[in-house]
Amino acid sequence: FHANNLTRALITGLGSMTGELNVTIENCTFVSMAPAAMTFFDLNPKNTSSFHLVVRNNLFSGVCEVGQGTWFTTRNVTSKTFENNYRTNGFVVANWGVDAAEIPVETTLPMETLFKDVAGRDFTITDKNSEVYTNGIGDPHWIK
């Protein structure tokens, strides 16, 4: 998934959800080419009986101005699992919205080196020795 001129979060609108809510974000590649204040995930249900969140084996990358952007906003989380998530070297947001241990691990390579053709939206992993490739992180479509 790549975001270009996105003005809302990638996942949002959970405010009116009721009952048990399970959200799993797994084996995805997210590349933000969006405005500076982009939010990746706005997960704020108000009336759920339980909210279980799993975020694992994802790759996050893109362009974000210093001091801008949010990774997660969450509310009323019953349980959460964050594991094996990575971000390309140099990709940061102002507000990760999670505990320090849950922030994605920074890769050795920046997106321009890790991906085949960022401008052409070809996010094939070019370095077969990179931690992203060897650990199978992100969308399997880009790990060839």
Where are these regions (language model features)?
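Extracellular beta-rich repeat passengers
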Residues: 1-121, 143-144
